[in-house]
Design a protein with these regions (language model features):
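A conserved structural/catalytic subdomain of Rossmann-like adenosyl-cofactor enzymes
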Residues: 6, 208-399, 414
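Long recognition/docking surfaces used for binding and targeting
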Residues: 32-111
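Conserved S-adenosyl-L-methionine
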Residues: 109-206, 211-212, 262-265, 275-276, ...
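Short, well-ordered loop/turn sites that connect or cap secondary structure elements
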Residues: 131, 252, 446-447
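DNA target-recognition patches
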Residues: 214-224, 403-438
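A short glycine-rich beta-alpha junction/loop motif
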Residues: 306, 370, 471-479, 511-539, ...
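Non-catalytic DNA-recognition/assembly elements of restriction-modification systems
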Residues: 347-410, 423-426, 532-572
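A short beta-sheet element
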Residues: 441-444, 448-498
Length: 572
């Protein structure tokens, strides 16, 4: 297959034929029919066309592949599937149809968990990476080879390589590369635990699995020299998602460029804060490109494309979340869409901008575009927060000198709340004690269920809870809000104000050049979505369940830390 033929094969209609082939084998074999079996059977039928016996087919397959996994798997299919079915498929379908099934079937909604990188995404990645014919391109987590084949065909890159841990996917990639007759180097391996700098890749791409739970992630990555030389894994709490991302960048040749597709949670998840700060402070992150939802057939969630290179003084941010073309039930990126995104990447416009370390620091290194482009709410579907509250007040203005006279180490049942005491979106349980509080400050005591929000950016928000036996005095750098519970669930408002949309509204209504603050007047104009009480309560119930789980984990951590300390003491 040359490049021209490869492009022509993309236009071959094969969905009906693929369905017919799968129907032929249903009931004839015990295992579940799948795209994995479909591609193998189509390859065997294609290979059998000039042959006349099973023995000749086995010999032909053996001459095509030198890796034991692919060879043994194809021999297994020849043994498992009634040979007359292979003969029938070979006789009934022409070469181009069989080749199209082998090369492109995942792009045409044949239901399977083996899916590849969509064509439009591949083209966008290669435009942004600026892949040239003399590049060595490495795909870490290469799956079924979609990105590799398209990249070889579209760019003519000198060397195209892939690493994949899943044997089935690697076999599909191997078969596809053979049918396309593209010289692609494929390797079975683990991109988290192994060093692949030997490929000397000038361009690296990765579309890794998302949301992977890897309990022993530190043990998995400790022998990956590429990663451990890039970052101190003992200093940073690296999640599996960021291990995939950083492993990709770590395998890039100096002077090269890396692109990683990842779901949006990595942009704001609290546990990844330090890693996000690190990649920006070190100048590793070149660009953040928010992509539209429904680009992948297997999920509707939106993804973000992270571009890495060296010595970046600013980060390019592109909000391309609305740039796509509808194609039946999914979205695709057409050539026009791609050029629009690339143009925004190269030059600032209404959907792109260059951001500094200080810009990200103000947002606590949350990287979602809505934080930086603002959010214009639809007022027709929202209600001003002032209409949902009984009061919005500022905390007590107490001088440092006066506060020193009021502070005590004794437990008095009266506490003092400062901005610093709001951690991880909740109020610190060990607040400082106060004594002899003047009656003029009694109006500033917080009540159970009040929302507390910092007066200045970055905006911290917390809910007052479990305070019935304690009085808490709010500082003047905080606002406290009494919600009208007859109109809205207070925790729903808390959730919304903590969201990207809520934070974007707060930022948009802030004033000040050095320190951004929001006035009570502007705070009252914040718009809250008009959800039914039932919808609010459902969301709040789930939210509070997650909070309980986090509290439990914190308590378990404290217990384990104490037991470890006691064990250490036994050594002495």
């Amino acid at each position: 297959v040359n490049c021209t033929t490869y492009k022509e094969l993309k236009n071959v209609s094969y969905e009906k034929e693929a369905f017919d082939i799968l129907n032929r084998i249903r009931g004839n074999i015990q295992e579940e029919t799948s795209i994995f079996l479909l591609i193998q059977l189509s390859y065997l039928a294609l290979n059998y066309k000039p042959l006349s016996s099973k023995e000749e087919l086995i010999e032909s397959v053996a001459s095509d592949f030198n890796d034991e996994y692919t060879l043994n798997q194809l021999k297994r299919v020849i043994k498992k599937v009634p040979f007359e079915i292979i003969e029938q498929v070979s006789d009934n379908y022409d070469e181009n149809t069989l080749k199209a099934i082998i090369l492109f079937s995942e792009d045409n909604d044949i239901r399977s968990n083996l899916s590849g990188t969509p064509l439009g995404v591949t083209k966008l990645v290669n435009e942004l990476l600026e892949v040239q014919s003399d590049d060595t391109v490495l795909d870490l987590g290469s799956g079924i080879g979609s990105y590799l084949l398209e990249t070889k065909m579209e760019t003519g890159a000198e060397k195209v390589c892939g690493v994949e841990i899943n044997i089935q996917m690697n076999i599909i990639s191997t078969i596809r590369a053979k049918v396309a007759q593209f010289p692609i180097q494929l390797k079975l391996g683990n991109i988290l635990s192994q060093d692949y700098r030997s490929f000397k890749a000038t361009k690296v791409f990765s579309n890794p699995p998302v949301g992977v739970r890897e309990p022993g992630i530190d043990d998995t990555i400790k022998d990956n020299n590429a990663l451990t030389e890039l970052i101190d894994i003992e200093e940073y709490n690296i999640s599996a998602d960021w291990a995939f991302i950083l492993s990709s960048y770590a395998n890039q040749k100096p002077g090269g460029k890396t692109a990683v597709l990842m779901y949006n949670q990595v942009l704001f998840r609290e546990q990844d804060h330090d890693i996000r700060e690190k990649i920006i402070s070190e100048g590793w992150l070149e660009a953040i490109i928010a992509l539209p939802e429904k680009l992948f057939p297997s999920t509707a969630i939106p993804f973000t494309l992270l571009i890495f290179s060296e010595n970046n003084e600013t980060v390019r941010m592109v909000d391309a979340s609305e740039i796509s073309t509808r194609d039946q039930k999914k979205n695709i990126l057409t050539n026009k869409n791609i050029q629009e995104i690339v143009a925004a990447y190269k030059q600032e416009n209404e959907i792109s901008k260059h951001l500094t370390y200080e810009d990200f620091e103000k947002q606590e290194f949350i990287l979602t575009p809505i934080r930086y482009f603002g959010f214009i709410p639809d007022a027709s579907k929202m209600t001003p927060i002032d209409d949902l509250t009984r009061s919005i007040n500022r905390g007590a203005m107490i001088s440092r000198k006066e506060l020193d006279t009021m502070t005590t180490t004794k437990e008095t049942g009266i506490k003092y709340l400062k901005i610093q005491d709001i951690e991880n979106a909740s109020i610190n349980k060990n607040l400082p004690n106060l004594k002899n509080v003047d009656e003029k400050y009694h109006n500033y005591f917080l009540e159970e269920g009040n929302l507390v929000i910092s007066k200045s950016s970055p905006y911290k928000i917390a809910r007052v809870e479990n305070s019935k036996n304690t009085k808490i005095l709010a500082t003047g750098n905080l606002y406290y809000i009494e919600i009208d519970e007859d109109k809205v669930n207070p925790t729903f408002i808390e959730m919304y104000l903590k969201s990207d949309e809520g934070q974007a509204q707060l930022e948009r209504l802030s004033t000040g050049s050095v320190i951004e603050t929001i006035s009570i007047k502007n705070l009252k104009t914040i718009l809250i979505p008009n959800l039914s009480r039932e919808e609010q309560d459902t969301l709040v119930k789930e939210y509070l369940e997650y909070e309980e789980q986090l509290d439990l984990l914190d308590r378990q951590k404290e217990i384990i830390s104490q037991r470890r300390k006691e064990l250490i003491e036994k050594v002495l």
